[in-house]
Structures are given as C-alpha cells and as structure tokens.
Amino acid sequence: MGEEAAGVRPELVREAEVSLLECKVCFERFGHRQQRRPRNLPCGHVVCLACVAALAHPRTLALECPFCRRACRACDTSDCLPVLHLLELLGSTLHASPAALSAASCAPGALTCYHAFGGWGTLVNPTGLALCPKTGRVVVVHDGKRRVKIFDSGGGGAHQFGEKGDAAHDVKYPLDVAVTNDCHVVVTDAGDCSLKVFDFFGQIKLVVGKQFSLPWGVEITPHNGVLVTDAEAGTLHLLEADFPEGVLRRIERLQAHLCNPRGVAVSWLTGAIAVLEHPCALGTSSGNNTRVKVFNSSMQLIGQVDSFGLNLLFPSKITASAVTFDHQGNVIVADTSGPAIVCLGKPEEFPALKPMVTHGLSRPVALVFTKENSLLVLDSASHSIKVFKVMEGNGG
C-alpha cells in the first residue's frame, strides 16, 4: 500500500487531504486516534468524534448535523470506514502531525522470543502467571497435582505446592495468581470461590471466602493491596491484609455493574487499573466478545475499547484473553484469535493499536513484564512460558 501511495501525484494527495480527510467543522485532519476518528452521521455527512461530542447535548446526546440540520443522537453515529481506509492507503504520503510523531515515539519496540520453559508435564493447562517483585521468580498456577509451581528467573529450579483436594488449604481450581510485595502468593480458587494466600514455602496464611461468587483475576497494587475481580457478581474488590500474620484488615468494593470481569492489571507508573470484561451477547459465545475498561486511581473511567472497535482498526479479529501495563503506562493485551500480543496505547489515546508479537504463540492467556522490560507470556496450548525481549529501535 505504501508503494502504491508513493506513486500518487502530490497535488492529488493534497486535494484528498483537504477535501476528504479533514473535518469541516474543526478543520483538523481525521486520524485513527479516538478524538479524530471520522464518524458518519445518519444523513451521510462526516465529522470527527471530538465534534460529535461537542455538538451533542450532555444529557440527551441529541445533536443536529452542522451542514443539513438533520436531527440525530450521538449514539446513532458510526465509524466512516471509507475515510479510515483512505487514511491507511495514503498514510505514508500524508504530512505527519506532531501529535502522531509523539505517539509513535513512545510506542513500545518490537519483541523477539529468546527463551521458553515449562512444557507439557512440567505444566498442565496453566491459567495464571505472576512475578515475585523482589526475587524475580516466576509463579504459575495450573492443573497439576500441585497447583502452584515456582521457577527461578531463568526457568529452572522449580518447586511446587498447593495440593489438589477438598481441604480448606487445598487448591481446587486455580484461575489466576499474583505475588505480593512481601513475597506471598495469592491464588483465586474457583473450586470453593475463595482467595488463598500462601508464603513462598507453601504454608497457607489466609483464606478469604464467602465474600465472592466467582473470584477470577487477581493483581497487587503498589501499596500491597490485592485487587480481585468477581466474574459472577460483576465486581472489583480491594483487599488489605497483614499477610505474614494472616489477618484480613479490610475489603472494599471498588466497582460494581461490571460485565463478567476476569483479568485485572494495575499500572505502577500511574495507578490506573485495567479490567478485562467478557460481555455475554445473546446467541453468541461470551469468549468472542471482550472489552477493556481503564480506570484512574480514583476509579473514574478514563478509557475503554471492545472487540468490535478493535476489529474496525485491525484486519483480523481480536479476542482479548489477558491484560497488563508496560513500564510506560501502555495497555497491552493478549489476543487468542491472532494469536498475538497487541499494544492498545495509553488510555487517553484509545485505541492506538500496535501489534507487538504476531508469531510464536498458540494460545496466550497471561502476561507480565519484568523489571528488565522483557515480556513473559503464558501459552496454555504449549503449556509453557515464553520470554520476549524488547528490541529497542525496532519499534515505531
């Protein structure tokens, strides 16, 4: 496409830029970033999303087309795909805006797989992955006889605990795992709908039950709190505890009315919290429709994007199975449809789509960045952890 566009006469490109690729309300150029996306009004006229928001009534969302005065509502607008495709076709020949250059400069680099460990037998149908912030050890929960397996940072020296059984301290069906700042392992157990905390030697420290209907995703905050999603109740909880003493200090519901929330992640840079929802659409598989919501540290919604919105930007279907933040505050998701790892950009830029890994994965289900900026991906199809290194200078 870039070569074809390069052969287009400059005057035609300029004419297209002025006549077709510019919002005639604010005279800003259309783009793929959220505020500049071209939106079709029901009458056929096209304006940018920022102008739709500015023209719409704050409560009723009613607006009039600025050109023909036909009434409609903001929710009646849709992405103008011909303009988006034209932007893609002529992208390399258009004059890059400073904002676009800034966005490109902070995008993460390309990733290359340079190590893998685990494999069938060592791991069996793994579901969750975490890193110990102090030691760099890798913790995985899976369907083996002992549910929790701990590797050293290089993938060797594994030890395990968390017997499969019916006792209160056993782990029946682990869904996710996290490691606290003081090296305690936190597991969500769907078998008895509880949250279980172990020390690194496998001694049970705390069991939190009854508060959850189906605890799923778990993550640790910078202040050593525990974030837990409840997929059945549609909630996000924050737990604070004295882990060495095994005492639960308090539990707070941060969000309600979420739709089947599973994965959760927190940015240590900004304090933002990302929640991965699996909305159940009537007559469709819930696993094929996903949505990422990002809240700031005050739990105000600052960005969201769903499978439908992503599929307008990306040539193949995206089904998010896991979410995390990189060290720059970008939201990163695992895609099981690709399979791939995709950067969605910062929440205020949603969706600034950038594929990071498109080869070497079968079914990625969990992600975590190391302090050295390597990316660990849990691949449930190959029952292994794959380590990708950020190749600085290959991105952008």
Swiss-Prot record:
Swiss-Prot/TrEMBL catalytic activity: S-ubiquitinyl-[E2 ubiquitin-conjugating enzyme]-L-cysteine + [acceptor protein]-L-lysine = [E2 ubiquitin-conjugating enzyme]-L-cysteine + N(6)-ubiquitinyl-[acceptor protein]-L-lysine
Source species taxonomy: Eukaryota, Metazoa, Chordata, Craniata, Vertebrata
Name of the gene this protein is made from: Nhlrc1
Compartment(s): Endoplasmic reticulum; Nucleus
Protein name: E3 ubiquitin-protein ligase NHLRC1
Main location: endoplasmic reticulum
Gene Ontology CC entries for this record: cytosol; endoplasmic reticulum; nucleoplasm; nucleus; perinuclear region of cytoplasm
SMART domains associated with the record: RING
NHL repeat windows: 110-154, 158-201, 202-242, 245-298, 299-347, 348-391
Protein function: E3 ubiquitin-protein ligase. Together with the phosphatase EPM2A/laforin, appears to be involved in the clearance of toxic polyglucosan and protein aggregates via multiple pathways. In complex with EPM2A/laforin and HSP70, suppresses the cellular toxicity of misfolded proteins by promoting their degradation through the ubiquitin-proteasome system (UPS). Ubiquitinates the glycogen-targeting protein phosphatase subunits PPP1R3C/PTG and PPP1R3D in a laforin-dependent manner and targets them for proteasome-dependent degradation, thus decreasing glycogen accumulation.
